[in-house]
Amino acid sequence: MPMFVVNTNVPRASVPDGFLSELTQQLVQAMGKPAQYIAVHVVPDQLMAFGGSSEPCALCSLHSIGKIGGAQNRSYSKLLCGLLAERLRISPDRIYINYYDMNAANVGWNGSTFA
């Protein structure tokens, strides 16, 4: 059930076609989870500042049942910051990513939970 959310001040017109699919496929490879369970949500055009500047920035979160931890998170940070830099032109030092290891009983899907 990985869910990756990107809140950014980058305009919608600057989000390339296929970006959501690319994020999904990269997360499939990085996390070893099936694409059918991965959700990606990009929220452009946000009123945001990072370090007092309104230059392009992003505040992100990655939620998952398992596959969250120190070494894994460093790997995800490298991958995701790289994609955001390349595709949205956001400098990696203007990106925060929060990681959440979810309890399966606290994640609802398809009329039930993952527990």
From Swiss-Prot:
GO terms for biological process: cell surface receptor signaling pathway; cellular senescence; DNA damage response, signal transduction by p53 class mediator; inflammatory response; innate immune response; negative regulation of cellular senescence; negative regulation of DNA damage response, signal transduction by p53 class mediator; negative regulation of gene expression. Substrate binds at K33, I65, N98. The active site is at P2. It catalyses: 3-phenylpyruvate = enol-phenylpyruvate; L-dopachrome = 5,6-dihydroxyindole-2-carboxylate. Its main location: secreted. Keywords: Acetylation, Cytokine, Cytoplasm, Immunity, Inflammatory response, Innate immunity, Isomerase, Secreted. The modification N6-succinyllysine is found at K78. Belongs to the MIF family. Pro-inflammatory cytokine involved in the innate immune response to bacterial pathogens. The expression of MIF at sites of inflammation suggests a role as mediator in regulating the function of macrophages in host defense. Counteracts the anti-inflammatory activity of glucocorticoids. Has phenylpyruvate tautomerase and dopachrome tautomerase activity (in vitro), but the physiological substrate is not known. It is not clear whether the tautomerase activity has any physiological relevance, and whether it is important for cytokine activity. It is an enzyme of class 5 (isomerase). The gene is MIF. The keyword Cytoplasm applies. The modification N6-acetyllysine is found at K78. Its EC number is 5.3.2.1, 5.3.3.12. Homotrimer. Interacts with CXCR2 extracellular domain. Interacts with the CD74 extracellular domain, USO1, COPS5 and BNIPL. One of its GO terms (molecular function) is chemoattractant activity. It comes from Sus scrofa (Pig). GO terms for cellular component: cell surface; cytosol; extracellular space; nucleoplasm; plasma membrane. This is Macrophage migration inhibitory factor. It is found in: Secreted; Cytoplasm. Gene3D superfamilies: Macrophage Migration Inhibitory Factor.
